[in-house]
């Protein structure tokens, strides 16, 4: 039974997911259905946490929109996600960047890593 579930989950996993790190600035394109229309929506922000659990892996992206912090959790292997693009590589010393929630302005900046 366990092998059956494992095989099914492996078939469902996406192969083209980039290797994300906390502190990276990413652009996530997702499909949004509004009424009868289907369109791509872009969410760009900093990866503040990553949870690696096989098919159930997820990552949290945070951005500041109109002065308010917005966080969104994406399932890595979701069929709703069209593309994940890394815009900038960040240098941080923590695995979870939850402390960014209480920072704003220049103190919330993350150093840029030049080579991936």
Curated annotation (Swiss-Prot):
Gene Ontology biological process terms in this record: translation
Gene Ontology CC terms, in alphabetical order: cytosolic large ribosomal subunit
Keyword Ribonucleoprotein: yes
Gene3D superfamilies: 2.30.30.790
TM spans (from-to): none
Assigned keywords, A-Z: Ribonucleoprotein, Ribosomal protein
The UniProt record lists the keyword Ribonucleoprotein: yes
MF term (GO), any: structural constituent of ribosome
A Pfam family hit: Ribosomal_L19
Lineage: superkingdom: Bacteria
Family to which this protein belongs: Belongs to the bacterial ribosomal protein bL19 family.
Its job: This protein is located at the 30S-50S ribosomal subunit interface and may play a role in the structure and function of the aminoacyl-tRNA binding site.
Entry-linked NCBIfam families: rplS_bact
Protein name per UniProt: Large ribosomal subunit protein bL19
Species of provenance: Blochmanniella pennsylvanica (strain BPEN)
């Amino acid at each position: 039974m366990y092998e059956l579930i494992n095989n099914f989950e492996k078939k469902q996993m996406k192969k083209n997911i980039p290797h994300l790190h906390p502190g990276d600035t990413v652009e996530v394109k997702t499909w949004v259905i509004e009424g009868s229309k289907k369109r791509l929506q872009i969410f760009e922000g900093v990866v503040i946490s990553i949870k690696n659990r096989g098919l159930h892996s997820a990552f949290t992206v945070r951005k500041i929109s109109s002065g308010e912090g917005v966080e969104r959790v994406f399932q890595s292997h979701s069929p709703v996600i069209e593309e994940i693009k890394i815009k900038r590589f960040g240098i941080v010393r923590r695995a979870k960047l939850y402390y960014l929630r209480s920072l704003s302005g220049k103190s919330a900046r993350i150093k840029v890593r030049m080579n991936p």
